[in-house]
Structures are given as C-alpha cells and as structure tokens.
Amino acid sequence: MSNVVLESLLKPLAEFYSPSFVEEIAINRPGEVWMRLNGGRIPWVSYRSEILSKQYLIDLIHTVANIYERPFDPIHGTPVVYATLPGNHRFSAIAGPNVQYDENDVTGGVALNIRGSGVSDTSFKNYHLERGKKLLKVKPRESNRPDDPYDRLMSAINDGSPILVSGATSTGKTTFLNHMLTLIDQNSRVITVEDAREIRVPQKNRVHFVLSRTEQTNDFNYARLLDLVVRMTPDVIIGGEISTDNASVLWEMLGTGHDHFYTTIHAESSDAAYAAYADRILHTQPAYNRTELIAEMKKKIRVVQLSRDGTLRAVTEVV
C-alpha cells in the first residue's frame, strides 16, 4: 500500500525523471524542475510546473521519510532525507531554514534531487577501458600557469582549478568572488555554502545552503553538508569564508573531484593564506602533518591575493 501511495504522489515528477535520456532531475525552488540530460550539448534544461508547489514538495519529503522510516523535521530536527525510490531512483532532499534559492526564502526553502540508477547495458568500453589501449586523461589539470597574472587567473577559472580568494578585512573578497562567478558558464549548476548569504550567483540553476555559526538549531552540520552537496551534483561549489567550523569539511569537499571550487579567507599574502587554511583544519583535525598539508594545498589550490591601501584595492598575487 505504501508504494502505491508514493507512486501516486510521485506522478507529477515521474514524467521528468523517468525518461531514459534523463540522468537526474533537480528542484531548487517550487514550480521549477531542472533535467540533466545524458550526453546533452547543454546538460541542464529547465521546465516550469505549477504542480510542484512548496506544499507538494514538503508533503513528498514527509511521505518518503515516513515510508522509509527516516527522521525528518526541517525546523527543529533533521532537515535532510535520503532514500531509494521505486525504480531504483536515488532521492535526496532538504527543506527548512538551511536551504534557500534567493533572499525571499526568509522562512527557508526546499531542494531535492532524483537520480536514475544508470544505464543497465553498459560495458567497460563506455568508460574507454579496452585491452591494449592507453587510459584517457580526462580534463587533466597539469600546471598551466602563464606568466601574465591576468592570464593565470583566467586559465585557473577556465580549467576549473580550485581558487582561494585571500585578503584582509574590506579588501573586497566577496565582491571579487561575485565577479568571478559571472565568468562561469551560465548553464552551470552552482551550490553555495555560507554562514550568512553574501554570494550573488547569476546562474539560475543554483542552491544556497546556510549554516549560521550562532543560530545552529538542528543537526545539519558541515559534516552532513558534505554528503548532501556531493549528491546534489554541482558543477560549481562556492564556500563562504573559511573558519574553524568549516575548514576541514571544505578541504574534504575539494577532494571530491568537483571543478570550480571557490572560497575566501582572511590573510595578508598567499603564503599566509595557505598557512591560515591549514591551521583552521588542524583545529578540528590535528592528525594532519602541517607541512605536508600546506604542500598539498599549494599543489591543488590557486590563490588570488587582494590588498588595500586607503581607497585603493588591488590584486597583488595570483599563484
């Protein structure tokens, strides 16, 4: 009986996620669904659907939680639900004050992904693994660092290198990061992680996660956030300012293989930025070797250093 109820409730969504050419769907706000197409020139396409109201989406999450015996209390308890739906579709959802689409979501929003189980008749050839053939280098990030600082930054943006925007207070780090986002493909799916909403994302396919440092009312913490973000299939991940609360999780997130990972930190030079990031990680993960951690950061992360002298703000390093 429970499957009958769930399948009936899923009907408005099934027309979007059931076709074989659809890899997954994402809902970032009521009334709109994004479909990720297999092999599409533009991977994400959006459709409006008034049936997908906020109340419908909340009811759906509650129903999934009840049927699969998952805890779900978006205000005071657990705002995230994971499940495997009929047809082996993977379901990930969040509702409440920790998720927003825009500033109008003052009481909280809702976001969910439903992902297919994959092509059943695949083979190793689909992954370009064949006897006697060399493995492909997919988006190799060999150190392409032009001499010109402008070209060096644009190269980092274009190849998806992680970028840390560093600077002292009032050097314009967030403003600079907001401008960088205008240079990213407008068809990209962007997820931000902040303790207060500051980042302005021009891409329409976006989700904002908010974890206040002072108003934590549920168990949706940075560790649980990591699990959710990777299930939400971002093309771009924007971390808020690095703190002792989020540093280790953002470092783990950077290691998940996603391109275009951007965040900011308070520091007065690129070397100080690497050191400050490492020190914040060590506050919660003391087992790391500091020297080795900084060396690994220098391999993976580009730093853009901003400095200020009175009203003058300038980029002083691009490494």
Question: Residue ranges of each PLM-predicted region?
Answer:
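P-loop (Walker A) phosphate-binding loop of NTP-binding proteins
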Residues: 156, 166-169
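Phosphate-interacting basic helix/loop segments used at nucleotide- and nucleic-acid interfaces
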Residues: 1-24, 68, 74-78
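Switch/coupling sub-region of P-loop NTPases
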Residues: 161-166, 179-298, 306
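P-loop NTP-binding catalytic core
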Residues: 44-158
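Amphipathic coiled-coil signal-relay and dimerization helices
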Residues: 26-27, 33-38, 42-47, 313
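Conserved lysine of the Walker
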Residues: 173
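Conserved P-loop NTPase
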Residues: 296-319
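Short aromatic-glycine motifs in intrinsically disordered, low-complexity regions
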Residues: 6-19, 84-86, 286-294
